[in-house]
Structures are given as C-alpha cells and as structure tokens.
Amino acid sequence: MSKKPASKDTLGHRLSRATEINITVTGRKSGRTISLPIWFVWEDGTLYLLPVKGSDTQWYKNVLKKRTMRIDAGGAGAEVQAVPVNDATQVKSVVEKFRAKYGSGDVKKYYSKFDVAVIVQM
C-alpha cells in the first residue's frame, strides 16, 4: 500500500469514468493485504460500495476490523477510511444507486444479500 496517492481531482475524474475499481484491504486474521476488483458508485465526492454477499462478504469483514483501505481507479489511487453502514434505509439507498448505474438485472444476478454497505467520503 505504498503507492503515491493521486490528487483528489485526478482520482475523482477516474472514478467518474470507471465501472470497476480495485480495493485493497488488510486481512483480519492474516494481516496481509488483499486486493480485488469491485463495482462502486461515485456521486458528489462520495464513494458507495456494496458487498456482493452483504455482511458475509470477506472484504467487508476485513473492513470491520481495519477501516483503512486503498482504492485504485485507472492508475490513480488513495488510502481512504471506510464507513460500514447497516442502517436499512441507507443500505437501500446505496442499492438503488447500484441499480441505477449497473441495471436491476445485473445487481440481482451478482448480489445476494443487501444488509450492509460501505461509504467513503473523499
């Protein structure tokens, strides 16, 4: 996680154009860094993440243990603080944002549990 951070403008521009980002979290048991591609929504300086299996998603469980994570989009990246959300109204709002961006069919196809989300203020 030692890459040089991108300026917020560069990262924001990349996020506004991307359909997928890479996140890097720290394993809650192993302590190792784990990177994986995920879908996201970028809106008004806020990054919304929806774990595919909700609270059963491994990267989400890792974020509960250590809130610092790295996001990378098109060569720009930054370390950020993740805010886990389990309020049903807030989670529903994030799910609707995902449906608007990716389509209801794909969200239904790939996401199996809608009990949590993650919000990152940039």
Where do the language-model regions lie?
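Covalent nucleotidyltransferase core used to form phosphodiester bonds in nucleic acids
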Residues: 11-13, 48-61
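Short low-complexity stretches enriched in small and charged residues
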Residues: 1-7, 28-39, 71-79
